[in-house]
């Protein structure tokens, strides 16, 4: 073989090796990307489940708090009505019967 052919053959071999390295890097990168994508999908699923659970807990707590506030407002309303009714009865010269213990 001549020196030119030998040089050309070595250049082709180097190009082939470089191409193989590039393809291997691309394959590894692709595998890593696919793995990362599935990992992100699983993380997103678990994050969504945690968020849903947290939202349900917050909703339950807010409903309890709303109930307490409404009960307090209703109690205050009844107390005001009782005081008003008692004043009206006092003006008429009447009173509620209260049992003493």
UniProtKB/Swiss-Prot annotation:
Entry annotated with the keyword Ligase: no
Highest taxon listed in the record's lineage: Eukaryota
Chief site of localization: cytoplasm
Gene Ontology cellular component terms for the protein in this record: axonemal A tubule inner sheath; axonemal microtubule; sperm flagellum
Keywords, sorted A to Z: Cell projection, Cilium, Cytoplasm, Cytoskeleton, Flagellum
Record's subunit section: Microtubule inner protein component of sperm flagellar doublet microtubules.
Protein name per UniProt: Cilia- and flagella-associated protein 141
Species lineage: Eukaryota, Metazoa, Chordata, Craniata, Vertebrata
Protein's gene: Cfap141
